[in-house]
Structures are given as C-alpha cells and as structure tokens.
Regions:
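Bacterial N-terminal signal peptides that target proteins for export
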Residues: 1-7
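Short low-complexity stretches enriched in small and charged residues
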Residues: 3, 26-31, 53-68, 190-191
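Structural motif
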Residues: 11, 35, 92-95
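C-terminal motif of bacterial Sec signal peptides marking the signal peptidase cleavage site
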Residues: 15-18
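C-terminal/domain-edge helix-coil "capping" segments
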Residues: 20-40, 50, 131-191
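N-terminal segment of the mature soluble domain
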Residues: 41-110
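Short, charged/polar low-complexity linear motifs in solvent-exposed/disordered segments
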Residues: 62, 119, 171-175
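Surface-exposed short loop/turn segments
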Residues: 85-150
Length: 191
C-alpha cells in the first residue's frame, strides 16, 4: 500500500512539474551583493510592454507576488515628464525605494520540427501508415533586471524561457514565480 501511494505521489508531482513551460535559463548576481546581502524593502516595478493594458497586467501581477507593500507599479508612480535620471534617482531615494525591477521581452525564438509518420503491419510494412507532420514551437525569452537605486547599478539579471505559452496570464504567473523564487533564494527579496 505504501509503495502504491509513493508511486502515485511521485507520478502526480512529475506531471505537475511537466506542465510548467517556463524555466529560469540564466542568472547573474553582482559579486559585491553576495558579500553584504540585505533584502530590498521597497521596489519600483517596470514592465515596458507594447500596450498599456499588458503593462498594467504584468506590473500588477509582479507587485502582487512581492511581499505586501514592497512593490509599486511604475504606471502609478512615474510621470511622462520624469526624464532626468539623476532627479528621478533622488526622488526614488526620497520616497524610500531601494530597488527597481525591470522585466521585458527580449526575443521570440521559432523552431520547426518534423515528426515522421509511423507504419503498422509487421515486417511487410506500410499496411497501415500515418503521415508525418511538422510542429512549430515558439520560445519567449524574458529578461528581468534588478537595480540598486542607491548604488545606481545592476545587482541581478535573469533570463526565463517560456515554451509555447497558452496565455499571457499563465505565462506571467510562471515567469514571476521563477524570478521571485530565485530572488528570494539569493536573499535579494524578502520571503
């Protein structure tokens, strides 16, 4: 009985992880940060996307995943007139921001795979045959960068890949989960 339960549990966990189509491909952290880790308490979230609705959805989802009160959407904080970098940095510091998360789509890779047909009917072959077919896969690469407002430099960078995403909502949730998990593991964001 225990063996059956263990096998069933293992199978269900395997199926659960097999459904996830997003993974963290690469990440880099500033070596100086690992010497003095202190989680960021308040971050500005920026997701420059093609349209304002998608940007709002993405930024809202990211802020929702970060610890309560730690994230602020750029669409509610930044003004179109905020073009001077030094003035903006001073304003961010004055308002208590210590980090900025910028997430953007960097590439969409397309690949075509030929899947050969199969024949049935034994050694004399081709009594019954299913034809081959082509499949096209799209991999969306999203880069996320974490900047220190005080030091004015990149502290962490990561690239996620999402294979054949079915919806923006699901893809964003998977990407944000992968990034949040990595940032918390590195001690950059609080758990």
């Amino acid at each position: 009985m225990k063996t059956k339960f263990f096998l069933l549990s293992t199978l269900l966990i395997g199926l659960l992880f097999a459904c996830v189509s997003t993974k963290l491909e690469k990440s880099w952290a500033d070596p100086s940060f690992s010497l003095k880790p202190s989680p960021y308490k308040k971050v500005l979230v920026v997701a420059p996307l093609k349209d304002a609705a998608s940007q709002r959805i993405a930024e809202d989802k990211i802020v929702k995943q970060i610890k309560a009160g730690a994230g602020v959407q750029s669409y509610s904080y930044l003004k179109p007139t905020d073009t001077d970098e030094k003035l903006l940095q001073a304003q961010l510091l004055k308002d208590g921001f210590d980090g900025i998360i910028v997430m953007h789509l960097t590439d969409v890779e397309k690949s075509v795979t030929y899947n050969p047909g199969t024949s049935y009917g034994g050694w004399y072959g081709y009594r019954s045959y299913s034809p081959g077919y082509y499949t096209e896969d799209k991999t969306f690469l999203v880069e996320t960068n974490m900047y220190s407002v005080k030091d004015d430099k990149l502290m962490w960078s990561g690239t996620t890949s999402s294979l054949n995403p079915t919806s923006l909502d699901k893809s964003m949730d998977e990407i944000i989960y992968a990034i949040k998990t990595e940032l918390q593991k590195k001690g950059i964001l609080e758990k």
